[in-house]
Each structure stands twice: as structure tokens, then as C-alpha cells.
From Swiss-Prot:
This is Pyridoxal 5'-phosphate synthase subunit PdxS. Pfam families: SOR_SNZ, ThiG. The keyword Lipoprotein does not apply. The gene is pdxS. In the presence of PdxT, forms a dodecamer of heterodimers. It comes from Pyrococcus abyssi (strain GE5 / Orsay). GO terms for molecular function: pyridoxal 5'-phosphate synthase (glutamine hydrolysing) activity. Its EC number is 4.3.3.6. Pathway: Cofactor biosynthesis; pyridoxal 5'-phosphate biosynthesis. PROSITE patterns: PDXS_SNZ_1, PDXS_SNZ_2. The keyword Lyase applies.
Amino acid sequence: MDKLKIIMEKGTERLKRGFAKMVKGGVIMDVTNAEQARIAEEAGAVAVMALHKVPADIRKAGGVARMAPVEKIQEIMDAVTIPVMAKCRIGHEAEARILEALGVDMIDESEVLTPADPFFHIYKKKFTAPFVCGARNLGEAVRRIWEGAAMIRTKGEAGTGNIVEAVRHVRLVNENIRLIQRMTDEEIYGVAEKFAEPYLRLAFSVKEISGLPKRVLENEPIYEGFTYREIVEGIYKILLEIKKLGRLPVVNFAAGGVATPADAALMMAMGMDGVFVGSGIFKSSNPPKMARAIVEAVNHWDEPDVLAEISREIGEPMRGQAIEELQVRMEERGV
């Protein structure tokens, strides 16, 4: 890679991460039409996520969940002045290209939609639009960052109104970061090798089908022209940055199961940079009040007296689901 290309890529990554930092400390709300988008903006949302259905309805409908209709996304973009994000399926580069052409402010390569690629996520560095991606653990987070994600969010378990999986993912990432900080650089390189292994799945599957040993050559490309060793080196650099910073090098939001102001405050208390709220707003009994209360909870997460006042007379939250009752675990989608 020539020097000019390296400088341009670094500049693009800086711009993408800069946009993500602009929404830090705020609430991003899922909306399905212009009216909901205006409610979110009036409540103080820093951005909205355009979908055809909120996650709870996607879960209920079943079938294949795809990118929202172009007309719906445009309707939402025309209705508000705050940034508009939209979801594409995991690995569906064509959907992502359409969203980029529409001019959305950020693309969410999301497990809430039905995955399109069973092996890989999109190589996000090929795009000018910034991406946000979900992660259950540090390995998933680092892989997405290496691919070019400008923002990470917990996966949680979308559409359930149950915060437990988001808490699990935050704790797993935070504890793994603390472990990385206690490791030597040599030990961290071993972690990078482990974290890079999912990129080998396609190559190993093809070798197995062909009756060949499950191994790759040193110069054998396995993903977007990169060899396994090149991917390891890239992940290793990110892990060293994490060791130095004591956190992810990109903005890190909570998502998946946030249904009340208390849920939002809990996520902020656990070190999150902000909160995505999917079904929790528009599946509650009073969306405008719930939206305002969750925004206030993120702003005052460390003030219990204020949180108590915020939580008064906001109506009923969305009906929650126990994780054990779920037939589909969206959080398990992706690699």
C-alpha cells in the first residue's frame, strides 16, 4: 500500500470516528416513520435509526428481515434535522451501498435483520459512510473495528425489553479489556491470533469439502485480499491501543433490551458512551414521555434523585420477554 493511500485511509477513519463522537453521551432511537422521528427529535435524541419495523415487531413477524424501503428512509430523513442512521443485513454490501447512496449519516450492519453472509461481515473501509456494529465480546468488537467500524454497540437481545444480555456483553468486554491490560505484548499477540480465527472459516470449509488439510498458506488471501497473518497484525495493533487506552478506541454504545430510564442509567453507569433504544420507546404506553425520560436518564445517570423524578408518570414500559422463552437469539448472528 503506497504512502498516499495510507494517509487517505487514516483521514477517512478519523472523519468516520469523528462523526461517532458527535453523538457521544446521547440517545439514538429506532423509528419507523416521520411522526416517530419527530417525536424522537423533540425528546432530545441525538440521532434516529430508520427501520421498517422496530425489533419487537421484526421478532414477532418472523421471515426474512431486510433493509427498510428506500421511500421510508427518505421520508424519515426529510422529517428531521438530526442525523439519520439505517440498518443493512450482515454481509450485504449492496444494501450498504444503497444506504450510502441515499446519504444516511451512519450504517448499522445489524444482527436485528436476517444475515446475508454466513461467513463474513462487510469490509467497511471500502465505504465513505461510517458504520456501527454490534458485539457480544471483545473479539467481535475488535474484528468489527479492524474491518472499519467507527462505533461499536452491545448486541443485547433486541426487541425483548430485557437488559440482561446487554449487561452480559458490557461485562464481558470490560473484563477482557482489564485482562489485556495485565498481559505482555507477546501474550496479546496470541490473543490477536485467536481473535482472527473466524476469518478462516470459509477457507477451512472449502479445504474440508475438497478433502484437504484445514490449513492456509502464509500468502493465501482469506478475506478481502488479506492473509491470516495480515489480519492478525491488524488486530494486534488494535489490542495494543486498547491496552494503552483502557477502553475501545471507538465510541461504544449500549443497545438491545433498553426499555426504561433505569435501564439507560445502568448502561451509562457501566461505562457506556450512550444508548440505542429500539422497541422501548414506541412499544411503551406513552412514547413521547418515555423518550424524554430516557434522554434525561442518560444525561443524569449518576443522580438518583433526578432519576426518581424522571421515572414518575411516564406510563407503562414495553412488555418484556424472558431470554429463555426466545425461539430466535439475534445476538448469536454474525462472527
